[in-house]
Each structure stands twice: as structure tokens, then as C-alpha cells.
């Protein structure tokens, strides 16, 4: 495995911080708030190699687990991870990693980036929905109505914007 460069370590830290900031930009809903964290997660997957994307979002999750209020609504701790949004938080790590892997395999074109990011978001939906079903005891359809349907339009826009920014930022970041 290739060692991380100083530049890559810096980008990992920056994306952990960006995810924390984007988590705070939210529209509160009764059970699960809409926020910009998934935007930062797929942007991370679009710009960093898989191991760096995994580390960046993993650091974000670890910061929240040890008590630093980086999760949506300035929440933190193990209790947040085992709450309604815990599945999404766990899903962020895999979403960033999978987005980066698919970007490497499928290529850097805009539509290919959008597809890779959509798969990453879908994985996050799966984790979030299953987690919510287990905690709440709700059926799949009820859980989908709380955990996926309200998020779809905004997440499509986040994917489109993240893919656009990836193309523009990649050139500047890796000169």
C-alpha cells in the first residue's frame, strides 16, 4: 500500500472538517434532519483516493464518537451513533470509500462521477434505513418515507453540484 503524503493527510483533515461544517447546515425535520454532510462525503470520494476518503470520513466519525460535536445539530457521542441518524453516519464512511473506488474504476467524466456518487448515496440510504427500521420497529415502507423520500430531491442536487466541483477542484488540488 502506498504511504500517505503530507498533502493527502492535509486533505483528509480538511475533508473531515468540511464534513463537520456541512453537517451543521441543516433543515430540521422531526426524526432525521436534512443536512449537507452527504455533499461533503461524496465530494471527498470524488477528489481523494479511496484510502484517503475512508480516512477523512472515518476521522469525522471518530471525532464525533469521542465527544467532539461534529454531528448534525452539534451532537456527539456514542448515543448519537445509536440514535435515528446513526446508520447514516456509519454509511458516510462506506459512501466516501465506494464513491472513490467507483470513480477510479469508471473514470472521471461528469456522468460517471454522478453515477459513482449516486451509488455512494444509495449505500448511505441503505445503512440509514435499515438502522432506522431496527431502532423504530417500523416497516420498510414507513422507514423509506422517513429516511429516503424526503432526501431524494436535495441529494440529487448535491450529487450534481459535487460532481461539477470535483471536475473543477481536482485540477487545482493535484498540481
What kind of feature is each model-predicted range?
Residues 1-54:
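Hydrophobic transmembrane alpha-helices
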Residues 5, 50-55, 106-112, 139-140:
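Membrane-helix interface segments
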Residues 14, 58-62, 86, 94, ...:
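Hydrophobic residues within alpha-helical transmembrane segments
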Residues 14, 21, 78-126:
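Short helix-perturbing small/polar motifs within transmembrane alpha-helices
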Residues 18, 22, 26, 44, ...:
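Alpha-helical membrane-inserting segments
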Residues 23-33, 61-95:
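Interfacial aromatic-anchored transmembrane helix boundaries in multi-pass membrane proteins
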Residues 74, 108-175:
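Membrane-embedded alpha-helical hairpins and interfacial helices in multi-pass inner-membrane proteins
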Amino acid at each position: 500500500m502506498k504511504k500517505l503524503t503530507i498533502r493527502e493527510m492535509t486533505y483528509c483533515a480538511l475533508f473531515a472538517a468540511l464534513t463537520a461544517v456541512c453537517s451543521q447546515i441543516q433543515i430540521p425535520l422531526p426524526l432525521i434532519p436534512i443536512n449537507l454532510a452527504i455533499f461533503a462525503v461524496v465530494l471527498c470520494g470524488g477528489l481523494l483516493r479511496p484510502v484517503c476518503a475512508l480516512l477523512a470520513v472515518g476521522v469525522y466519525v471518530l471525532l464525533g464518537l469521542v465527544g467532539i460535536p461534529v454531528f448534525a445539530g452539534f451532537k456527539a457521542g456514542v448515543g448519537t451513533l445509536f440514535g435515528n441518524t446513526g446508520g447514516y453516519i456509519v454509511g458516510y464512511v462506506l459512501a466516501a470509500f465506494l464513491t472513490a473506488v467507483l470513480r477510479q474504476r469508471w473514470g472521471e467524466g461528469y456522468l460517471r462521477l454522478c453515477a459513482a456518487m449516486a451509488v455512494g448515496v444509495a449505500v448511505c440510504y441503505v445503512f440509514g434505513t435499515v438502522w432506522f427500521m431496527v431502532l423504530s420497529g417500523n416497516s420498510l415502507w414507513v422507514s423509506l418515507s422517513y429516511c429516503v423520500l424526503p432526501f431524494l430531491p436535495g441529494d440529487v442536487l448535491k450529487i450534481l453540484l459535487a460532481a461539477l466541483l470535483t471536475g473543477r477542484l481536482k485540477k487545482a488540488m493535484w498540481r
